[in-house]
Amino acid sequence: MAIIKKFRIKSFKNLKPIIKLEKVSFSFKNRPILDSISFILNQGEILGLLGPNGVGKSTIFNLITGLLKPNFGSIIIDNKNVLNYPIAERATTFKLGYVPQYGGYFHDLSLIDNLKAIAEIQISDNKERTNIIEKMISKFEFDSIINIPAKFLSGGQKKKLVIALALLNNPKVLLLDEPFAALDVLTIKMLKELIVNLQSQEKISICICDHQARDLLSCVDSAIILSNCKIIAKGTPTELV
């Protein structure tokens, strides 16, 4: 397994936690999904959530963003309990960017119109809105495809578009749900390099969930392995391989 990420973080002891889950449990129709889950995403860290499909990885993201509410436990972002804030305010209050596994864009709109539509919602100042759109076009090298309807983009281009849309509100935290699913090997390599560069350039914290160890462990600082509703292991990629 080729390690793309040269581990910048030598010690996690002095890092500032940006997201903290404390003994979080969640059930759906009396079926346990998460059982007393606790972990920290540190500022400037790329953290992986690893486990088979159905183990609760996406549920964790839905709890953080407010789409779901835990049965027990607390979710702390920037020293604030997110459960005290309305769902509609969480993305802006806590500067969260979320990239879903599927969709996340307007299929029939062109790439540039996707950027404009989301920027219109999130950014009130016209000049700031124009600047951030131009930044995304440059950063993701969209120049040659800005007028193509999103539904005609390749899998990798669609994923880059959704990441760009998630970055429009200048988030502190980026959540990526199964970003490598259904992509070819070369596109996965490109996307992993993009994620690592994003963290380095934008200084944001990133949490990625995936079910493939070979994809996830090559681009994270640390990872958590989930099984049977619980965390069964934590560590750096070299410790977990």
Question: Could you say what each language-model-derived stretch is?
Answer:
Residues T65:
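Helix-to-loop junction immediately C-terminal to a conserved catalytic motif
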Residues L174-E178:
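Catalytic Walker B motif of ABC-type/P-loop ATPase nucleotide-binding domains
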Residues D210-H211:
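H-loop/switch region of ABC-family ATPase nucleotide-binding domains
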Residues P149-L153:
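Conserved ABC ATPase signature
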Residues G73-V82, A91-T93:
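Conserved ABC transporter NBD signature motif
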